[in-house]
UniProtKB/Swiss-Prot annotation:
The keyword Chaperone applies. It is found in: Cytoplasm. PANTHER family: 10 KDA HEAT SHOCK PROTEIN (PTHR10772), CO-CHAPERONIN GROES (PTHR10772:SF58). Keywords: Chaperone, Cytoplasm, Stress response. Belongs to the GroES chaperonin family. One of its GO terms (biological process) is chaperone cofactor-dependent protein refolding. Heptamer of 7 subunits arranged in a ring. Interacts with the chaperonin GroEL. One of its GO terms (molecular function) is unfolded protein binding. The gene is groES. Pfam families: Cpn10. This is Co-chaperonin GroES. Together with the chaperonin GroEL, plays an essential role in assisting protein folding. The GroEL-GroES system forms a nano-cage that allows encapsulation of the non-native substrate proteins and provides a physical environment optimized to promote and accelerate protein folding. GroES binds to the apical surface of the GroEL ring, thereby capping the opening of the GroEL channel.
Amino acid sequence: MAKVKIKPLEDKILVQAGEAETMTPSGLVIPENAKEKPQEGTVVAVGPGRWDEDGAKRIPVDVSEGDIVIYSKYGGTEIKYNGEEYLILSARDVLAVVSK
C-alpha cells in the first residue's frame, strides 16, 4: 500500500475498501450490477481526532493506519485519487477492527 497524500480532518478516516465478491461459494459468477458494496477495508490515514465539548483537547480516533476495519454499509464518502478508490469515513461509521 503506497503512502497517500490525503490527510483526513478531525475524526475522519481514509479507508481503501476491499474487493467486492466476484463469485458465490457455490461457484456462480456475480455480475457487476449485482455485487454488494464491501464493508471491510484497510485504514490508510487517520485524522487527529475531534475536539471535546470544551474545545480544550482532542479525542483520539480508535483506529490506526494499517488496521482492517468493518464499517457501516452506507457510511462515508467515496473518492477517487490517483486512479485508486477510497472511502472517507467518520470514526462513528467504523463498527469493528479485525484482529490480525
